[in-house]
């Protein structure tokens, strides 16, 4: 599926981002008209469909593009060039984002603002179905008057130096990224949480009866933990969490004001944007974004939000954006508690634990090679792996399993420790590798799980903040204790384990096969 695709006549070239759902029907129609295809992609169908209309009598390229796109079902962002007008480029979109920026030297069309490479002062967010012409002679020609959006200039590192991979650089960067998430915008003042980006919610907060967290992949795991944070404070009765890809109209509460919390590292995730489109005409729903990329699609379209401020992530597998998401959700839950209960001042120890998290992460990072050794990694180097935790740690287990899949190519599954006996137990055999997360909150129950697994002679690696467990030190990693956000310390260690295991398996962790950093298609 290399781009650009060229039409059969050779007159048109096209770049496409998205998925066309009815491309097989259109392809069959074109085959009957004598078109020959070089690939099985929906993109080649689009360029040949435009070509078909362009070759009809008295149809110009603008009309041909509109006639073709009117027949497309699905999402697309198209950039088209015609040999008869080589000084112009045509763009049109439906559902898939396109941004256009211009300066005195050139014009850039991109799917996200980072594509401008700090070369533009302003850009335009192209609307669905507006055919835009970019011309060397005439600049940008649109059918809609657009309001310019100011670009945010960001300093980008070009290499992961001094580290071998971006994945490791971003894991090690978490002491700084968490500090940025905590401090940018002055989010803690004495014993109060200040989240100016959520002022919109304040006037509705007494009427909100439903809160729904929505995300995909790593962000979904963060959402589950965010739900637990808020649920533990007993300020809202109905708190749910959904995978954005599975959310539909039937999941919208039947009554009452609803706050929809949407989490996305890129701010461009197609499945989340689909949810925004789904509920945009529902007056009882308030949308809130937790995103990392400033001025991204989701950030622009929600009612209010909080930026993660984790900094740019290059590696496909999310690391620092996950821990920043957890920190933001912790701040959000405490902020919501303050506003809802009018209990403005929080316990000083709560604030101190939150403030200490970046220092504790720094301590782990500085001592990681003594904390995790070759014996630990060899223990886990297998084709199958279980990771078990309870409460919030169940979702840390699931996030670890995702990392093991992404960068180690291991069939890893994360479960609640209590779920093991409901089926996964049947897969346990001698030497089967299991990571067990034993936190203080669930120590007794997880210790019972340990004994059950040990009796099956599985290979167990325990991660815990409890320093006095009677365990073989070669199968036991102790992390610092944080009574408010212990899960961030656990996942930091588990990210390091995933990275080291990827290297042992001779896999480049920065670029997992078949995966993309930003998922802009359903």
Predicted regions and their residues:
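Conserved short alpha-helical segments that host acidic/polar catalytic motifs at enzyme active sites
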Residues: 1-160, 164-167, 176-183, 187-207, ...
């Amino acid at each position: 599926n290399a781009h650009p695709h060229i039409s059969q006549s050779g007159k048109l070239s096209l770049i496409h981002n998205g998925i066309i759902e009815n491309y097989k029907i259109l392809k069959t129609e074109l085959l009957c008209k004598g078109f020959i295809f070089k690939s099985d992609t929906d993109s080649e169908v689009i360029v040949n469909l435009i070509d078909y209309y362009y070759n009809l009598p008295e149809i110009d390229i603008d009309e041909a593009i509109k006639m073709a796109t009117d027949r497309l079902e699905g999402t697309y962002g198209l950039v088209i060039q015609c040999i008869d007008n080589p000084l112009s480029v045509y763009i049109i979109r439906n559902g898939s984002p396109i941004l256009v920026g211009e300066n005195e030297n050139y014009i850039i069309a991109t799917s996200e603002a980072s594509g401008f490479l700090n070369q533009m002062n302003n850009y335009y967010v192209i609307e669905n179905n507006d055919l835009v012409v970019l011309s060397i002679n005439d600049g940008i020609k649109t059918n809609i008057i657009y309001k310019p959006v100011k670009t945010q200039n960001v300093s980008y590192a070009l290499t992961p130096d001094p580290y071998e991979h971006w994945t490791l650089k971003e894991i090690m960067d978490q002491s700084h990224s968490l500090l940025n998430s905590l401090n940018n915008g002055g989010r803690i003042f004495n014993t109060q949480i200040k989240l100016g980006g959520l002022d919109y919610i304040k006037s509705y907060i007494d009427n909100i009866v439903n809160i729904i967290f929505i995300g995909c992949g790593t962000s979904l795991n963060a959402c589950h933990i965010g739900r637990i944070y808020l649920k533990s404070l007993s300020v809202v009765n109905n708190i749910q969490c959904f995978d954005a890809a599975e959310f539909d109209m039937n999941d919208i509460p039947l009554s009452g004001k609803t706050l929809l919390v949407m989490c996305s590292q890129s701010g461009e995730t197609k499945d989340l944007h689909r949810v925004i489109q789904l509920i945009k005409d529902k007056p009882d729903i308030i949308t809130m974004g937790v995103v990392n990329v400033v001025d991204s699609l989701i950030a622009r379209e929600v009612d209010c939000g909080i930026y993660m401020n984790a900094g740019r992530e290059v590696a496909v597998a999310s690391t620092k954006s996950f821990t920043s998401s957890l920190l933001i959700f912790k701040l959000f839950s405490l902020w919501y508690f303050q506003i809802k209960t009018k209990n403005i001042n929080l316990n000083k120890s709560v604030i101190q634990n939150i403030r200490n998290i970046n220092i504790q992460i720094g301590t782990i990072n500085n001592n990681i090679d003594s904390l995790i050794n070759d014996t630990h990694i060899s223990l886990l180097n297998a084709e199958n792996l279980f990771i078990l935790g309870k409460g919030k740690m169940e979702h840390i287990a699931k996030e670890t399993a995702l990392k093991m899949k992404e960068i180690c190519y291991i069939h890893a599954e994360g479960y609640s420790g209590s779920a093991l006996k409901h089926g996964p137990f049947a897969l346990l055999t001698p030497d089967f590798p299991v990571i067990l997360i034993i936190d203080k909150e669930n120590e007794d129950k997880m210790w019972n799980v340990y004994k059950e697994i040990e009796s099956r002679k599985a290979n167990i690696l325990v991660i815990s903040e409890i320093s006095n467990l009677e365990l073989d030190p070669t199968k036991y990693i102790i992390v610092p204790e944080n009574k408010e956000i212990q899960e961030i310390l656990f996942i930091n260690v588990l990210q390091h384990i995933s990275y080291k295991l990827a290297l042992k398996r001779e896999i480049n962790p920065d670029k997992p096969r078949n995966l993309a950093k930003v998922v802009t298609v359903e």
